[in-house]
Amino acid sequence: MTTRRHRTRTAALAAGALLLLSACGHKARGTDLLQEGLLVEATLSSGRDLAWVRTQMGRQYRINDVVLRTLPAPPPSRLRFHVDVPARGHLTFAYGIPPEHHDGTPVEFVVNVARGGKEEQAWSQMLDPLGKPAHRRWQHADVDLARFAGRGVDVVLETRGYEKSDDARRALWGIPALTVDGAQAPLAIVYLVDTLRADHTQPYGYGRDTTPELLKFAGEGVVFEQAISHAAWTKPSVGSLFTSLLPGRHRAVQLRDQLDPGLITIGEMLQAKGFTTGAAVANSVIYAEGTGFEQGFDQFSGLHGAGDRPSKVVEAAGVVDEALRILETRRGMPTFLYVHTMDPHVPYTPPAPWDAKYEPHASAEHPATDPRSDYHQPADRDRLVGQYDGEIAYGDAEFGRFVRELKARGLYDRAIVVFLGDHGEEFLEHGAFTHGKSVFDELIHVPLLVKFPKGRHAGRRVAQQVQVADVLPTVLEALELPVPAPPAIVGHPLQAVLDGDVPEGPVLSEISHRGFVAHGMRTSRDKYVRRFSPDDDELYFDLKADPAEKQNRAEANRERVRLLRAGVEAAMVPNPFRTTLRVAGGGEYVLRLRTGGWIEGVQAVGLGAAENYTIEGNGRKLEVHLRPKPGQPREVSFGIRPMGAPVFLEGRRDGQPLKPEMVWIAHEGVHPAEVPLKLPELEPVDEDKDRLLVDMLNPPPADRAGVQVWLQMAGGRTAPTNMSKERCESFKALGYLGASFDCSNLK
């Protein structure tokens, strides 16, 4: 797999892949106007020329959490495209004014069509974001060009303003395309329901009627009975979905992590093959700025809740509406669509009548919306499950509406449609609620159903264990596109599983999230789990005899545990963060570190003959002997696997125990409350009331005498994104930050 090019990649990836066919031919397809060569003339007020505009074509721009590929159009400007307009042709596009210019004067957007030396205005609209709040987001338009059908037509996108602008991003056109009613083109859809555990759906044997629409869909597709997610919360799971890589490889593991921009996602793979790519996403963990999941998408719509802000309550109806709108704007074009609803996620607030569908019902005294606040007695668990199931039933109804609309538009039969969950939800099966805390089956066993084009394999059920990483190669195979070979990806096309050509393999799942660190390796018959924090233990379950994972049989199966443990450790990717200790100011130090994981890659700088370090306890303990001199500090750095495993520090200086004032943490140089201490992590756990340690990746001032502690990125890695106040508040609303967490001091 090659490294991806500049993040704001242009439409040149698709050059030549989509040809505009005869205007009257029955095989005419839609055309992306951002293709190289279609733009023939550009006049911009900023003085930029055609060559410059072509370098900007396709750069992504975000307005109100909707990211589009764009064209710069500072008024006055004219962008001329030479095209053939097909019969039944439409021009679809977005247009908008970036937030930094919402206090400026209005801008008029105009579409002109020129043919035979005569230019005619086909559409216009004035945007005034200062006076009209509704204009502070992307606007969308669909212009019927049927009367201009034929060859040799010029489409001119023009902007006019009350004042000339030299800012190239003063106004923007987004994703302009010629679309064709009734044209046939390949279509791939991945429809993900956040927080949906497999055993609460009817195709997987649930006793309640939560998913009648999914049950119908199962009859038209294939049910994969043992589909396993690679993580127990959204970001790493969707990262594996988009890249077909394990979480440690794609690097979107913890809350502030960014999907590794050096990787190529499913969107980028398909975009390079001439597909238009769109997404409608309800979870801000995926669409927030800086997460990186929008790479490879022509349009990536983050859906807001009440108050037009990121919210924990974004109902599926709005997501489905946006998904259908995206399909409508790309008619007749090869299309990949990602849909991400999140109704089963806390809080459990299904709309009527689904809020009263299952007993025992919630009430004012027992609201049953969030187990973190509403669980007080055993009966509350049943109420919470009832509301969770109500959310599933509501979301299922919307999925049914989506499928019916695909059929009504004539899109369903030729499409590959993948339905899945990203992770599950727990209700005290192993002593906890919600998700992101372990890798037990209630969290990693997800529904996975695939409707193949032309009804192939309809009605089949597959017992062989598969994984979320298999979705990407399955989509490519269904579209008859090349499938990368391992190790570029870890997944296999599910078509090969159906044909019996792929033997069943184990699946790795891992979690390193807000103080919970664990990983596991699962086969269809057994499972190994290693927990590092807050529990520190090793578990083994016989899934045939104990599918609920209640009986730890590790002692009785030591050889099997050894084999699975070795498999996990071989698959784990090195931690990109390195813990660094700098000792300065003179004195004799003995520092002892221990971890629930294992220490690796120790590097020491400046050590003299009498200074050394030793590793003991099978890699779990590190002892360092240092004698720094004034002006001659010593540094020792090391990695910890898995990422997030706790590290504890204690030690002595000149024979006396270390005191808190001798230890300096990160850029602020704060002192711990006590020694021994648990070394700080990049992000806090539930009960942490302090702000995020944004500066953990910067060292304390070098002149501080004592032990200085901070984190460094391993070579070639980029630091995680600093969290904005808005992003912090949306993550807090979703429950990924504790209720007492303070976002007010962030920008």
Enumerate the predicted regions with their spans:
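Bacterial N-terminal signal peptides that target proteins for export
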Residues: 2-13
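Bacterial N-terminal signal peptides
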Residues: 12-22
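Catalytic domains that recognize anionic headgroups
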Residues: 23-67, 72-747
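Accessible peptide chain termini
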Residues: 1-2, 737
